[in-house]
From Swiss-Prot:
This is Pre-mRNA-splicing factor SNT309. Coiled coil: none annotated. It is found in: Nucleus. The keyword rRNA-binding does not apply.
Length: 175
């Protein structure tokens, strides 16, 4: 971090700079960094297949489970009659990327938290749908340029080594 020359009359002591660097590193280490979401490939492939996005979750999902609840043939021995629990179980089955284990049914704050997570993931999908196509072509250009440069370097090394081998063969014949 640098000082402002028009505010700071003297040089900032190195101790302060080091302390700021340590605080920044400490805060950066505390940030929970997660790898790329495991279903990004699925989101990208979604354009070609059926729409399985979170936005397709409608009241039909909830009513479907109300119907299943009343279907005694489909009930299991440990069947839970709570509509909200059924809804969360179906949500968990259809959208495994959302961890619903921390949500407690019948509490409005927890349901709103699920809505927040749902909105956040929808935002991620929108960003991937709109921004990724713009950046992928640039990434391929950079990758192709890198591969061309690497191929040129390898070819030059190959030519140089062949020349050295030929020189060595000529030297051996002279001996």
């Amino acid at each position: 971090m640098d000082g402002l020359s028009f505010v700071d009359k003297g040089k900032i002591p190195d101790g302060y700079k080091n302390e700021i660097d340590q605080l920044v590193k400490k805060e950066f280490a505390n940030i929970k960094r997660e790898p790329v979401h495991p279903e990004i490939r699925g989101i990208l492939a979604k354009r070609k297949g059926a729409d399985n996005s979170v936005s397709t979750l409608t009241n039909a999902l909830y009513t479907e489970y109300l119907k299943q609840r009343n279907n005694k043939k489909r009930r299991t021995p440990d069947f839970n009659d709570d509509d909200d629990t059924l809804f969360l179980e179906e949500y968990r089955r259809k959208y495994p990327r959302i961890d619903t284990s921390r949500y407690i049914p019948n509490e409005s704050s927890e349901v709103s938290l699920l809505g927040i997570v749902d909105s956040y993931l929808k935002h991620q999908e929108i960003v991937l749908d709109t921004l990724l196509p713009q950046t992928v072509s640039n990434q391929w250009r950079i990758n192709n340029d890198y591969i061309r440069q690497t191929c040129t370097i390898v070819e030059e090394m190959n030519i140089q080594q062949r020349k050295q081998i030929n020189d060595l063969e000529i030297y051996r014949k002279r001996l």
